UniProtKB/Swiss-Prot annotation:
Putative toxin component of a putative type VII toxin-antitoxin (TA) system. Its cognate antitoxin might be MJ1305. Residues 15-135 form the HEPN domain. The keyword S-adenosyl-L-methionine does not apply. Disulfide bonds: none annotated. This is Putative toxin MJ1304. Keywords: Toxin-antitoxin system. It holds the Pfam family HEPN.
Amino acid sequence: MEDSGFNIKYAKLFIKRAEEDLEVAKVLLKTNHYPDSVYHSQQCVEKAVKAVLILNGIIFRRHVVSGVFRNVIYEMKIEDSWKEKLLNLIPKIESLEEHWVMPRYPEPYFGELWNPLEEYTKEDAEECLKDAENVLEVIKDFLKEKYGLKQI
């Protein structure tokens, strides 16, 4: 693993990309591109979580991050209030993880064809966006307090 200066820079880049994904999700929602909005909400959360993992010495190249994130939360020496706030994000993270493939591709699914253009609704996109905003906000606040990352 690289030195902590490298990890801080790396984590900041992940947060910047998470912020961009969130903005893209908003634009796509406004233009009625619901599956793609859902996907970018998922990407926002994945990248925000990976920033925390990086600052804990973990480079994780998979899309399902909730389990590793949960373990890191339990291992970190942090105040109980932060532990609780971060653990409360897990259900939202797990819910969004379900959307890293499904919004992008039509697929055979239980004998039928899954068509994301027909399956994802405005309400789905709004809910995913709301969850992504919440997860990103809490993680950014945590990174500012725990790691002193003021400029993220």
